[in-house]
Amino acid sequence: MSSTEVPGEVSTSVSSYFDTILILDFGSQYSHLIARRLREIHVYAELLPCTQKIEALPFKPIGVILSGGPYSVYDDIAPHVDPAVFELGVPVLGICYGMQEIAWLNGRCVEPGIEREYGPATVSMEPEIKTEVFKSFFNSMPKEFEVWMSHGDRLSALPNGYETIGRTKNSPFAVIAHVTKPIIGLQFHPEVTHTPLGLQLIKNFAIEICHAKPNWSMENFVDKEILRIRKMIGPSDHVIGAVSGGVDSTVASKVLKEAIGDRFHAIMVDNGLLRLNEAEIVRETLNKHLGIQLTVVDASEEFIGKLKGVTDPEKKRKIIGNTFIHVFEREAERIVKETNGKVEYLLQGTLYPDVIESISFKGPSQTIKTHHNVGGLLKDMKLKLIEPLRELFKDEVRALGELLGIEHSLVWRHPFPGPGLGIRILGEVNAAQLEIARKADHIFITEIRNHGYYDKISQAFAALLPVKAVGVMGDKRTHEQVIALRAITTSDFMTADWYDGFSIKFLKLVSSRICNEVSGVNRVLYDISSKPPATVEME
């Protein structure tokens, strides 16, 4: 059953309104895909670190999935799940490391494999399955099916109280299940596309075994979210909204506008790190298409002054985040005086991938970098954050934007990071570097639009590298800076591929324009790194 709200309190979790499957993350690169697959079948899922204490959960899940991970369960430093997971009385599905965790906790029957197993394999069903409940798990599945393996350890024996449901050539315990309890383990990864019928298995677990109601949709989400915001804000308080013009802040602003009307104040901080003519474009866009009056606060000198001499990426993000909050607090005080109201909340367009990337715990996962929407904020911040998109993936945000009637060109606009050009200039940020990065980026994006590539790409930008290269212009030797172009395609920004659709003619044109029109640049590179191992942004 779904979690219920405590009378008199305002729920801050989407899980209060939808049947929720909890995913405990052991550090697998595929963990986020589990959540995505569940949401594709309209079942809500939340991902939390494997160290999550069950007694501290703000909701009761209707099922739990233990993800894969890079460690061996028998290592001293291996992470382990809170045993209380198995006392919740809900179905549990262990995937790869998650399955080995189940086996380790029930007999220590995990050992190094004779051979590592990476790649495709064929699972064969056992002819007789004693565990009646798990016949549902293989509903609509053939007796043999292809799966994707990615493991170095194996089960040395069946855990106490379990039986074998499926096996592969190299894995005699590829699928196991408890004889009496709704606990199942898979040695393979059903969440990846390389397991063609994996989505059916996930659906069977969620719908047939956990009995989840498949009612997760943007239509159901937005009405509940607007009501939640109204309860949280009350009848007289005001909210200031951090607006950048990107799809995230635009959709978030529209949600707030729908919830509290003119008590929402959209504010854009011109931190001096914006794209060319960005403030003017965003002001016109919000006024014309959304009916939202935008206040632009020019704090460029304040930001750039504090970034002087700073080259470390994390320090830059922290400085930008802290300064951002200070500026907003000042603006909130102004609005309080003008409206005789009360400003307690700051809107941010934080998305679920932002949250996942920023999770750090004592286990295999490492914080890759402080995300600009959830990190870099002062611990003593006076404003409370309100993040209506916090539980959504990017494709869900776009679907929500279209549902709210936002114009297609706005919904599908490429993202722009909160720290702006500050993290696209590798090294120290100053006026001269900003001029170079801004002009190069403008040329790149303009040509992408002109040549019909824009809607085929998820994000593109030009970055200024902290190196100089020797070149020749006319008959003179030059020693100038280097621009790196980056364009990626992705469905959720958790993983991404570099875009390979540009023609050589197009790249030649962009390179020529940048070298000729941007003073101080004599070399242009194209970044062909995917995520992972790279991140989308360079800092």
Swiss-Prot record:
Transmembrane segments: none annotated. SUPFAM superfamilies: Adenine nucleotide alpha hydrolases-like (SSF52402), Class I glutamine amidotransferase-like (SSF52317), GMP synthetase C-terminal dimerisation domain (SSF54810). Pfam families: GATase, GMP_synt_C. The active site is at residues 96, 189, 191. This is GMP synthase [glutamine-hydrolyzing]. PANTHER family: GMP SYNTHASE [GLUTAMINE-HYDROLYZING], GMP SYNTHASE-RELATED. PROSITE patterns: GATASE_TYPE_1, GMPS_ATP_PPASE. It is found in: Cytoplasm, Cytosol. It catalyses: XMP + L-glutamine + ATP + H2O = GMP + L-glutamate + AMP + diphosphate + 2 H(+). The keyword Membrane does not apply. XMP binds at residues 317, 475, 531, 537. Catalyzes the conversion of xanthine monophosphate (XMP) to GMP in the presence of glutamine and ATP through an adenyl-XMP intermediate. Gene3D superfamilies: 3.30.300.10, 3.40.50.880, HUPs (3.40.50.620). The gene is gua2. InterPro entries: Class_I_gatase-like, GATASE, GMP_synth_C, GMP_synth_GATase, GMP_synthase, GMPS_ATP_PPase_dom, Rossmann-like_a/b/a_fold. It is an enzyme of class 6 (ligase). Its cofactor is Mg(2+). Residues 20-215 form the Glutamine amidotransferase type-1 domain. GO terms for biological process: GMP biosynthetic process. The keyword ATP-binding applies. ATP binds at residues 244-250. The lineage of its organism: Eukaryota, Fungi, Dikarya, Ascomycota, Taphrinomycotina.
